UniProtKB/Swiss-Prot annotation:
<keyword id="KW-0597">Phosphoprotein</keyword>
<feature type="domain" description="PTS EIIB type-4">
    <location>
        <begin position="1"/>
        <end position="164"/>
    </location>
</feature>
<dbReference type="GO" id="GO:0005737">
    <property type="term" value="C:cytoplasm"/>
</dbReference>
<dbReference type="InterPro" id="IPR004720">
    <property type="entry name" value="PTS_IIB_sorbose-sp"/>
</dbReference>
<keyword id="KW-0762">Sugar transport</keyword>
<keyword id="KW-0963">Cytoplasm</keyword>
<comment type="function">
    <text>The phosphoenolpyruvate-dependent sugar phosphotransferase system (PTS), a major carbohydrate active transport system, catalyzes the phosphorylation of incoming sugar substrates concomitant with their translocation across the cell membrane. The enzyme II SorABCD PTS system is involved in L-sorbose transport.</text>
</comment>
<keyword id="KW-0808">Transferase</keyword>
<dbReference type="GO" id="GO:0016301">
    <property type="term" value="F:kinase activity"/>
</dbReference>
<dbReference type="InterPro" id="IPR036667">
    <property type="entry name" value="PTS_IIB_sorbose-sp_sf"/>
</dbReference>
<protein>
    <recommendedName>
        <fullName>PTS system sorbose-specific EIIB component</fullName>
        <ecNumber>2.7.1.206</ecNumber>
    </recommendedName>
</protein>
<feature type="active site" description="Pros-phosphohistidine intermediate">
    <location>
        <position position="14"/>
    </location>
</feature>
<dbReference type="Pfam" id="PF03830">
    <property type="entry name" value="PTSIIB_sorb"/>
</dbReference>
<keyword id="KW-0813">Transport</keyword>
<dbReference type="InterPro" id="IPR018455">
    <property type="entry name" value="PTS_IIB_sorbose-sp_subgr"/>
</dbReference>
<dbReference type="GO" id="GO:0022871">
    <property type="term" value="F:protein-N(PI)-phosphohistidine-sorbose phosphotransferase system transporter activity"/>
</dbReference>
<keyword id="KW-0418">Kinase</keyword>
């Protein structure tokens, strides 16, 4: 499997993803990795309907994503991974999927989260997950839209939450 793009964006498939990021990725398929969405049949149906024309969409949990990645049937498939949170990205990488770079696009503000940029709000688990991804060698790219300059999420985390 060829990973062309991996992105954390809790809105998953929306305007920016369908018009810009999916084209930028040049992928054959979007794989949404989310145990929460995987269990929600209505949300799965809506996300598949929102996909760009001609783009295949699969919604899986982490164990299924790892199994599919390791299936020789998909070795030449170009995929765009979408996640709702960084913890599942950590689980994927620890499960043996080599992820070089992760784009962080949008993580909405909710109670218990702290806003670190115009579109990204984090809680302690998110912070720990991003720090762990960095330690695992994943390059972190904070950019909501393609034309935004890349921003150092770890510097923002240290500024807002303090250094580790």
């Amino acid at each position: 499997m060829i990973i062309t793009l991996a992105r954390v964006d809790d809105r998953l498939i929306h305007g920016q993803v369908t018009t810009v990021w999916s084209k930028e990725s040049n992928a054959d398929r979007i794989i949404i990795v989310s145990s929460e969405v995987y269990k929600d049949d209505i949300r799965k149906t809506l996300l598949k309907q929102a996909a760009p024309p001609g783009m295949k969409v699969n919604i899986v949990d982490v164990p299924k994503a790892i199994a599919v990645y390791n299936n020789p049937k998909y070795q030449n498939e170009k995929v765009f991974y979408l996640f709702t949170n960084p913890r599942e990205v950590v689980d994927l990488v620890k499960g043996g999927i080599p992820l070089e770079k992760l784009n962080i696009g949008g993580m909405q503000f909710k109670q218990g989260k702290t806003q670190i940029s115009k579109a990204v709000s984090l809680d302690a688990d998110d912070v720990a997950a991003f720090r762990e991804l960095h330690q695992l060698g994943v390059k972190l790219d904070l950019r909501v839209v393609k034309t935004d300059p890349s921003s150092d999420i770890l510097a923002k985390i240290d500024e807002v939450f303090g250094k580790e």
